[in-house]
Curated annotation (Swiss-Prot):
It comes from Francisella tularensis subsp. mediasiatica (strain FSC147). GO terms for biological process: nucleotide-excision repair; SOS response. This is UvrABC system protein C. SMART domains: GIYc. Pfam families: GIY-YIG, HHH_5, UVR, UvrC_RNaseH, UvrC_RNaseH_dom. The UvrABC repair system catalyzes the recognition and processing of DNA lesions. UvrC both incises the 5' and 3' sides of the lesion. The N-terminal half is responsible for the 3' incision and the C-terminal half is responsible for the 5' incision. Keywords: Cytoplasm, DNA damage, DNA excision, DNA repair, Excision nuclease, SOS response. Residues 20-98 form the GIY-YIG domain. It comes from the Bacteria. The gene is uvrC. Its main location: cytoplasm.
Amino acid sequence: MIVDNSKDFDLKSFLANLTTHSGVYRMLDKHGEIIYVGKAKNLKNRVNSYFSKGAKDSKTLMMVEQIARIEITITPSDYEAYLLENNLIKQHRPKYNILFKDDKSYPYLVISRDKFPRVSFYRGKSAYKKGQCFGPYVSISSVKNTLNTIQKIFPIRQCENSYYKSRVRPCLQYQIKRCLAPCVGLVSQQQYDEQLAILKKFLAGKFSSVLEEISAKMYQASEDMEYEKAQVYRDQLVVLRKLQQQQIVDIQEDKTFDVIGIYMQDSYASIALLQIQNGDVVADRHWSIDAKGQDKTSIMHAFLSHFYLGDEIRNIWPKNIILSKVEFADITDLMNSISQKIGQAINWIIAPAADNLKWLKLAEVNARQKLNIYTSSKSQYQKRLESLKEFLELEKDIKRIECFDISHFQGEATIASCVVYTDDGEDRKSHRRYNIKGIKSGDDYAAIHQAVSRRVSSGLEADNLPDVMIIDGGKGQIHQAEAVFREYGIQDKVQLVSLGKGVERISGKEKIYKGFDDTEYTLDEHNPGFLLLRQVRDSAHDHAIKGQRKKVSANRQSSIIEEIEGVGSKRRKALLRYFGGWQELSRASVDEIAKVKGISKKLAQEIWECFH
């Protein structure tokens, strides 16, 4: 329950009447924004400690000065407090908490919830919404290799539902024995579910159990004189036994362990996580953070909560976790909560020796190298931001930059891209594209006007307009953006700037225009601010090109058949329904195409020639 909901907050009275139960506290500033989230076994003691006399670091003192209100949530146990704290930090990202930004989003294998489920891969933490998840995997290539291996062993469908539902005959995967063809009823629900159950055990790391089960099924099928079925099981066993020496998932969980190394320098820290299976590093992940006012123990505490109590899906948990040296007593409760969540005891190794010490040193070397790269890159980026701020004559620091670029193919399939950079660097998750509609072919000015108008409208509603908006183009393009700014009255809220290549069209010689200023500016090609403008512009251009190519490709696939005289919408639908997609149609012979109702041999020949 949230204890305080009053508008007039009396801090003295609040502190005096605080409960001694465990729970989570939230510090809010005068704007009502959460600036810090913490948990405590004893809320009264912990919250009061912020306002008592005693040595405090500068970061804590600065935070306390901004506290206008405190809210608490009482939890049934310390474990629930850890979980709630972790979720609130991820949800609100308070500026005084230690925030971890993972270096990438990891892919998972997902088994869908369909009647005849498909197995596929999905990148991101929302994978669990798609079905039962296994992972995360180290990279896209590793998860694709796993999918390929699965297809060789388990004939479970991997096709999209749209393709699956349109089938009227088995596809090539059935012919090469990599699918049971549930799409056309060639397998019973029971048989499919049996294969699916074995696959799930395989992905969960129960390798020995899978071998035993398939072996038993093979012998049973042989005794029942179902020799074709026995041969299928035998083929599965052959492939599985070849994999025993290089299996995808670990089959001996007691040999799995995580190693967490921390390296600190100045006001920054880097965490390296090595995941070890059977003596091999199967994954390494890194986080770099602003650690001003923090020590190694507090960083480790925050990281363990973030990583092990978070919502990332995992199927195999380590029996051992090796840590950089920290104050053990300060994280004991957290360790117990982690063990409670995963339902197994963990051997925490804080003073490693022998081989364990070698693993820890390797993790710490990785952390140091990553931090060196991070601080060097961050320092360079900050110099560029400061230089751009100076050139644009801005009073406040630049927190968010957005850049627009237009791309089209011969005037069609027009796309506007918008890329986002913050004071931390490129924010890929915030990039987006706009499909431009209702304009004349190749009208870049109208495209810019439409894209900027849509962005400003949504930005005013969400209160997230950028500090600087860059337009790729010259005077004509920036004038379109200026018109939008006047329409919405934001001339003084966002600094507008454009970057045009001019007559020479040479990179490094671009002309710069500021919003509502007709002066043409140039900067030295090595100027840090100019380098940032070009960096952001190039990113927007790449983002636009990729989106435009996807759109053109999709349009081409759907129109290739339309160009053939005699193939209307009905015949096009019949072809797609019969073959399930353009790819299968492109592989079909003339005779196969002619089998489609309404398609003559002559027309089939024309369709075949379209693809060859």
